[in-house]
UniProtKB/Swiss-Prot annotation:
This is Cyclotide mela-3. Probably participates in a plant defense mechanism (Potential). Binds to and induces leakage in phospholipd membranes, particularly ones containing 1-palmitoyl-2-oleophosphatidylethanolamine (POPE). In vitro, displays cytotoxicity against cultured cells. Not active against Gram-negative bacterium E.coli ATCC 25922 or Gram-positive bacterium S.aureus ATCC 25923 up to a concentration of 64 uM. The presence of a 'disulfide through disulfide knot' structurally defines this protein as a knottin. Pfam families: Cyclotide.
Length: 29
């Protein structure tokens, strides 16, 4: 399925593919 973006950004990075940092939470691109 599609990645779920909701983890906390770590140093401006998101480890889930297809997600970007919208501090402090990762959002879908």
């Amino acid at each position: 399925g599609k990645p779920i973006c909701g983890e906390t950004c770590f140093k401006g990075k998101c480890y889930t593919p297809g997600c970007t940092c919208s501090y402090p939470i990762c959002k879908k691109d």
